[in-house]
């Protein structure tokens, strides 16, 4: 998608662009803070590489324990819905949270992440999948972390 198509999608959902940079935006669940972004393909600045946004409000760290159960239940509902649309996801989990990934035939990937505090989603373009696969080949062939030119960390 082009950046302008992503902006149109952002606007269609009623998300409010940041005043200084429309690639960042505020969703209805944000509590007024920027909680979404549109990534730009480094090779083609008019092409979007990904869109990232929260599906729930980001809770403060001292939230009531029962909220954790609600977020986990909601996360499971999102996983079930996406599994029914796109097939079984790959899953990773840790003490911090869970991550489910759907790699579609179109080479778009959907990454759903959940912690005790929030649920977010990243929808990546085929170009991002190409980059991820190239990075994995680099490491599979013995490349080390210090020699990697591009590393993506997800704050879940």
Task: Give the positions of each predicted feature.
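Short helix/turn-capping signatures at newly exposed starts of structured segments
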Residues: 1-96, 107-109, 115-156
């Amino acid at each position: 998608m082009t950046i302008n198509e992503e902006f149109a999608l952002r606007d269609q959902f009623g998300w409010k662009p940041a005043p200084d940079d429309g690639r960042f935006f505020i969703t209805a669940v944000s509590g007024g803070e920027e909680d979404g972004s549109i990534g730009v393909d480094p090779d083609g600045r008019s092409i979007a590489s990904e869109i990232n946004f929260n599906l729930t409000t980001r809770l403060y760290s001292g939230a009531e324990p029962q909220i954790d159960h609600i977020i986990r239940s909601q996360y499971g509902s999102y996983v079930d819905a996406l599994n029914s649309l796109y097939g079984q996801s790959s899953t990773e989990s840790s003490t911090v949270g869970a991550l489910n990934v759907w790699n579609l035939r179109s080479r778009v990937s959907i990454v759903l992440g959940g912690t005790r505090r929030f649920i977010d989603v990243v929808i990546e373009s085929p170009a991002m999948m190409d980059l991820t696969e190239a990075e994995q080949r680099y490491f599979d062939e013995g490349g080390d972390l210090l020699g990697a030119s591009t590393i993506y960390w997800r704050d879940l």
